């Protein structure tokens, strides 16, 4: 009897050991895949970079501010000659460097009476950081950027709105959990959660196999980013009364609409606080038409911000 119990105990220990080894292997694989996809620096291609001198009447002032681990982020306040009516904080996408890719949009907003605070997130262009670290870092950096604009004393006390694309589209919605005072948000080609975006990318590479490591991804992000990782765009919407405009093109292969637009529309499609605009054939940069930047759409953006700011001014 004792020999039988001893054999069962040894077998149980072996099985436990195997389970631990499998978990450790999955954990190591998860971290490696995660870092390969997200934990790297991104620099703008100098051949395509725009400069403030390329735009008539555009001015900017450089600032540095600290993010969560003390890393210094570089941001610029862009204005035209007229006094701004409000401040738009812009969050850029991931993979192409910092905010420089959005200079045309920045200039449009500035020329139409808004100050634009645009910065390079951790691990991008002029900001510090060996790598981005992960998608929740975008929410963290935006949280610190909005607080810097509000609290540093460097900027006029004006209503604040947000604009984000892709990674930035996720960030500007999720950050509402921390900044419900924001008046209006425009999110282009964004996604609801970091985990969802990892799933979308992982399915392209590993198919259904991605679902075996998603629990480890969730744990890894929670350990690394805390509550920032668990808060979604939908959480931000529920914590804020901000007006929200959501844009997406249904042929977007980088961020499929099912991971953002569709989720939002199911809950808020009939909510007057939300406005949904979809396209069929604009790909990931849905603010561009076949000729380039869609200025009619940007005029719509400006009108959206103006309406929300004036509503708050009027009480």
Ranges and model annotations:
Residues 94-108, 121:
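The serine-hydrolase catalytic nucleophile loop
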Residues 132-153:
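Alpha/beta-hydrolase active-site loop
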Residues 240, 246-248, 252:
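Short beta-strand/loop motif that positions the catalytic acidic residue
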Residues 242, 256-266:
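Short alpha-helix in the alpha/beta-hydrolase fold that links the catalytic acid
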């Amino acid at each position: 009897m004792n020999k039988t119990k001893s054999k069962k105990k040894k077998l149980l220990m072996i099985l436990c050991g195997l389970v631990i080894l499998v978990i450790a292997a999955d954990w190591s694989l998860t971290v490696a895949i995660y870092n390969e996809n997200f934990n790297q620096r991104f620099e703008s291609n100098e051949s395509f970079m725009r400069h403030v001198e390329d735009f008539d009447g555009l001015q900017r002032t450089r600032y540095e501010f600290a993010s969560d681990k003390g890393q210094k982020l570089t941001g610029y306040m862009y204005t035209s000659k007229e006094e701004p009516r409000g401040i738009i904080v812009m969050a850029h996408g991931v993979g192409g460097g910092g905010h420089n890719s959005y200079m045309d949009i920045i200039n449009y907003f500035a020329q139409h009476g808004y100050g634009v605070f645009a910065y390079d997130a951790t691990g991008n262009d002029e900001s510090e950081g060996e790598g981005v670290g992960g998608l929740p870092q975008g929410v963290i950096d935006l949280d610190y950027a909005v607080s810097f604009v509000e609290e540093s004393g460097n900027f006029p006390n004006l209503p604040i709105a947000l604009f984000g694309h892709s990674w930035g589209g996720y960030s500007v919605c999720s950050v509402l959990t921390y900044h419900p005072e924001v008046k209006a948000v425009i999110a282009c080609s964004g996604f609801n959660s970091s985990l969802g975006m990892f799933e979308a990318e992982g399915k392209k590479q590993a198919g259904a196999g991605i679902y075996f490591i998603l629990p480890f991804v969730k744990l890894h992000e929670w350990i690394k980013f805390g509550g920032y990782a668990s808060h979604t765009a939908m959480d931000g919407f529920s914590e804020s009364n901000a007006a929200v405009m959501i844009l997406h093109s249904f042929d977007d292969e980088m961020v499929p609409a099912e991971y953002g637009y569709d989720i939002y529309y199911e809950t808020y499609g009939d909510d007057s606080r939300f406005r949904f605009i979809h396209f069929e054939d604009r790909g990931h940069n849905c603010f561009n038409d076949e000729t380039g930047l869609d200025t009619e759409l940007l005029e719509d953006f400006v009108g959206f911000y103006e309406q929300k700011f004036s509503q708050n001014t009027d009480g």
